[in-house]
């Protein structure tokens, strides 16, 4: 499953690997990878494979789920498809409460005591997913965990999720993606080394000259 999804993401350009010409993230950090899972919305076969995979993860790890919650905005569509497949209620969670109307942060019903699974598109440092989890917990929901399309497997993300006491499972990850990219001839040994070094310590730009 991990390599299949990784292959899909590479084929449609949802993930770019540029170890020799790094991207600059909004945080200012240099990165050899850029992920835009919103592109999956435009490819029916890919998004169907993702929805099926997320459903499988949820049934395996969180079988008692009662509500599917999407993170705004990238997780909303995938949460909708998954909730439809599972015939479950769905809601989505904003990064912060609206400044007008009812001032909702959670849109749709997520009632006190309900068991919720969060659908996220990407786990980087885990910040947006944890914000979603905290909002649901404040509303009295029991958050069973998070499922996502892809994770960078960063230690910072793992630590934040552990600190928030929330389980997280992804369809694919950085390790599988780099392996598939190498198998497809998209990167060579030198590029693979840079990618491996970046993941060990993203904040240390020494990987650029590795």
Curated annotation (Swiss-Prot):
Keyword terms, alphabetized: Glycosyltransferase, Magnesium, Pyrimidine biosynthesis, Transferase
Chain positions recorded as orotate binding sites: 124
Annotated positions binding 5-phospho-alpha-D-ribose 1-diphosphate: 94, 98, 100, 120-128
Keyword Ribonucleoprotein included in the entry's annotation: no
Taxonomy, superkingdom: Bacteria
One Pfam family linked to the record: Pribosyltran
Keyword presence, Magnesium: yes
Pathway(s): Pyrimidine metabolism; UMP biosynthesis via de novo pathway; UMP from orotate: step 1/2
Cofactor(s) needed by this chain: Mg(2+)
Function summary: Catalyzes the transfer of a ribosyl phosphate group from 5-phosphoribose 1-diphosphate to orotate, leading to the formation of orotidine monophosphate (OMP).
Family: Belongs to the purine/pyrimidine phosphoribosyltransferase family. PyrE subfamily.
Quaternary structure note: Homodimer.
Protein name: Orotate phosphoribosyltransferase
Gene: pyrE
